[in-house]
């Protein structure tokens, strides 16, 4: 019995204990063994069914998001071709809607990201300006002043994912802005890394909240004051950065917040593949 308990302790899925047990010699013990086998089989079947349902739901969500992006893009083009004060407001709301659908898509994919990324050489300057273009109406409406320094060199990563991460950081800078808001984006080299810094002069993050900002659903003191805060954006940024081997850190004070993304120059591909 002790041997059996020890074996069970070593299993991460203890319902599989019957798979590693030896067939008992005594008839009475064999009955219990068969019952364990039946219970284990039933559990595996139920787990398989739940996994299939989860996968079907995930595929449905991804398909729905792709479908909804088509009318969003069409409405955006119509508004851009017929500029009025009303369509300017609508463009801002469409930009927000597109950002939320992107967030839902990446959340759905975040569990199995290895099937979706494509690591290749990319220019940081290009992806930064793409992210700014993605949020141009939000930035204009907020009165945000942009200060974008010359981006240093190229790195190896997934351009689409990095663009999504930057979109989240830009949206946060707008959400937690103060009067006369400023957003600075810069790079610098540090040993074998290129560090991309997104910095704002917003309301900042409380020191007690800073260690938890990448936790799922965590909004913090300032987040609770803003109804739009969900605690998902930075959580997704952290999760995607981990998958891509990008370091992500945050510094904050009452004068603003700086998020740093650290790209390894030489070993990023190895880290992602491992």
Predicted regions and their residues:
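Short conserved segments within the C-terminal catalytic ATPase subdomain
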Residues: 136-148
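Conserved micro-motifs of the catalytic ATP-binding
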Residues: 113-117, 150, 154-157
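Acidic ATP/Mg2+-coordinating residue in the GHKL
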Residues: 200
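Short conserved segment of the HATPase_c
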Residues: 205-218
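Short beta-strand/loop element within the Bergerat-fold HATPase_c
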Residues: 180-192
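Short helix-loop "hinge" at the ATP-lid/N-box region of the Bergerat-fold HATPase_c
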Residues: 173-174
